[in-house]
Amino acid sequence: CLVRLRRADLRQQLAVAGLRRYDPVRRTLRLHPELAPGQRGFQMAAQLALLEAAAPIATLVADPALPSDEARALARIGLASYFAGALLLPYGAFLGAAEALGYDIELLARRHGVSFETVCHRLSTLQRPGTPGVPFFFVRVDRAGNISKRQSATDFHFSRTGGTCPLWKVYEAFAQPDQVLTQLAQMPDGRRYLWIARCVTQHDGGWGRPGRRFAVALGCDLRHAGRLVYGRGLALDRADAA
């Protein structure tokens, strides 16, 4: 279907409706004027998912395992986001680039014209049978420790709010917004993980309107760290490294 795209100037309306607003009668998609190019692409792809893949998405969210309207709404958003990531960063080509670049998130973001956060989220979904990538878990938190996004390709689970160790490197990222930080961490069950974290800012734009800051992080079991540029120079074999 033909959809017209417009950069919206109705900021107050968009603040209520989110980063995009679709008018099905006029077939017009309005995007927040302060979105970066990569963010605009992602929002367009997510809306395309809701239009072109509406039937399969509806089938999936009708699963009885989703017990409430809220759960079904979140699943619908998650499926649209997965569609958008797959459209912008096709599985085979993106996995090949990730392996060739040692999963360097910043290089992957520049090569594909998307954000650091989009790359992190896509990396956490590369688990196709037969051709899997590194099994990452992805998380986005605010300064208070509230988790606003999470995705896991493993059995690692997060609490939704609070209770996170203050020594977790993810929180240090807020004090070093332009740096990618790494950390080896050992869990109470003895399992060890490599964490990669960076502070990202969502700009609302203009004087007196500071952007919202989040810390975005990827983690993986330490046995996969040798495949990543972030594992270079770390004492991965030392029992006390974490």
Indicate where each model-derived feature is located.
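Conserved binding/catalytic microenvironments
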Residues: L2-A242
